[in-house]
């Protein structure tokens, strides 16, 4: 099997495994993340209503001014703090972390740790 196809199949299996366990609700919405080479983004989703409650990204003006590059651990940690602050304003205290096909390592771990430190509970 080609190396890229093998990587893709592993990611798809991991995404399905994680996503089958998670369903966001109004009292405990789903915090899904998107990690690219240049940026890091997340959104808090209520799956029952089918609505996005809030979002944060390295593309936001407040984050963009503070970081040099959007695709590193420092930027992900800053997004974690920002989403925790926005969640507190919106009245969301606990969420379910949906890491998708990403391993809990590096930027994903930095994001989760920063969000926990800022008061968001997983």
UniProtKB/Swiss-Prot annotation:
The organism's place on the tree of life at top rank: Bacteria
Region of interest (Disordered), ranges: 1-25
Record field: compositional bias (Basic residues): 1-22
GO biological process: translation
GO molecular function, one term: 5S rRNA binding
Disulfide bond annotation, renumbered to this chain: none
Annotated Pfam families: Ribosomal_L18p
Keywords: Ribonucleoprotein, Ribosomal protein, RNA-binding, rRNA-binding
Cellular component GO terms held in the UniProt record: cytosolic large ribosomal subunit
Assembly information from the UniProt record: Part of the 50S ribosomal subunit; part of the 5S rRNA/L5/L18/L25 subcomplex. Contacts the 5S and 23S rRNAs.
Record family assignment: Belongs to the universal ribosomal protein uL18 family.
Function, in words: This is one of the proteins that bind and probably mediate the attachment of the 5S RNA into the large ribosomal subunit, where it forms part of the central protuberance.
Protein name: Large ribosomal subunit protein uL18
Source organism: Rhodopirellula baltica (strain DSM 10527 / NCIMB 13988 / SH1)
């Amino acid at each position: 099997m080609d190396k890229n196809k093998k990587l893709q199949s592993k990611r798809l299996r991991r995404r399905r495994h994680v996503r089958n366990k998670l369903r966001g609700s109004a009292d405990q919405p789903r915090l899904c993340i998107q990690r690219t080479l240049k940026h890091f983004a997340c959104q808090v989703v209520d799956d029952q209503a089918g609505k996005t409650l809030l979002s944060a990204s390295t593309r936001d003006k407040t984050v963009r001014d503070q970081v040099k590059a959007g695709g590193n651990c420092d930027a992900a940690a800053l997004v974690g703090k920002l989403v925790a602050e926005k969640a507190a304003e919106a009245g969301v205290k606990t969420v379910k972390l949906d890491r998708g096909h990403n391993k809990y390592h590096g930027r994903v771990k930095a994001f989760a740790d920063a969000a926990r430190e800022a008061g968001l509970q997983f």
